[in-house]
Amino acid sequence: PERYDVIVFKNPNDGKQNYIKRLIGLPGDNLLIENGDIYVMDEVDGEYEKSITRKPPEKLKNVLQAVDDTNHIGELLNDVQWPSRWQAFDGSKQWTTDATGENPVFRSSAQPDAHWLRYRHYQPFKNEWSTISSGLLPTRFRNNSLPPGRLIGDQYGYNDGVYQNNEALVSTQNLGLHWVGDLGLEFWVDIKSSDGTLMFDVVEGGVHFVCEIDIATGKATLSAQDEASKTKVTFQDASGNPVESPSAKTKINGSGSHHIMYVNADDRLNLWIDNNYVEFDAAAFTWDGIPIPTYSADDPGDAEPAGIAAKNAELDITRIKVLRDLYYTSVKGQGPLGSQISTENETGESISIIEAYHRDPESWSSDGAADFFTAKKGQTEPMFRLEKGETPDKDQFLPMGDNSPRSLDGRVWDGEKFVERDMLIGRAMLIYWPHTLNKPIKYFPNFSRMGFIK
């Protein structure tokens, strides 16, 4: 099997039980989980050198988690006129919003300068839901006040609503305990002009990862604008050589409608146009330090972590989704549900401190925030060592679940943290009976979730 395949295997602690997880570690690997990513550490002259592992594009595409979708805004939020998360926060008139239809349409007029439509992660606080449920907008948004956005965390929608005796054991916000810097942008655009420039970006650690597409020629160019960041980024080609301005040819050729997905994951930029993967001459990159969130009034950075702009081009954006990569946690939680759920983050800080940093961009420049966001980063020793067996059937593999905060996988098993090859059953191929919908009748099949596993 290959890394990031979904595999079925016998539970090492109960040979009668089959497990299904994603394969993360291979025989001979020294593994490190850091910043939500998976690293392999090779020993050189008595010291370990780490290299990030990268999900193949099609596997990456299928594990991305939805953060926001302009076509799916909660009814309660609409009722209180919750502020749009997508706005021209700089006050530019280049962008207008048509809200007359079922879903908003964002329109850009043709202007010589690029003004950005940007995203702020306006997530209701736990104590605001009672106000919203009573039909009122929380006070922080009244009088046309628009505070900075909060950080995007590793929240999983299918972990929401963990209850016992009608009491919430873990609130929604408590299931997003780690800042996720690996973000993506998916949007549907109708380009009205035959030339001009379409631009979009995602931000991590204050670095704007910008993609510019020449509408007339289809040439796409990447850049890492890291002036406001505490770390610097270098693009590298497949041979490890630095590349200043990576580029690629796309199928965009003048006016037309397109579906675009742009994702920063595993220290690589990924672009799909109309479901076709775009190959750049260099899309992988390295950091010269540890990325931490940045914010200033001039450049909100990670408080506005995604954006779309146009220059000398008229276009309509009919739908926008904000996405995030999986975040693999390296802690064994001791929450109210036992080891299956983590109510701490990797710093060991309390939920109140974590929440305070996540929601307050002004605090990100403090020494305390720097210590918080770099805690358990820059480690020099692997966490898991997997052996090649004396015979192939004893080779060791490490499986992990995509729902990392609640996955009972190799990270948290008692005893050995691996599966031997002779316990592997095979690759998972098909979801043939997902959890039923129970409507319009009980046990009604969920046909939309049936399909091949990637």
PLM regions and their residue ranges:
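Extended hydrophobic leader/signal-anchor segments used for secretion and membrane insertion
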Residues: 1-454
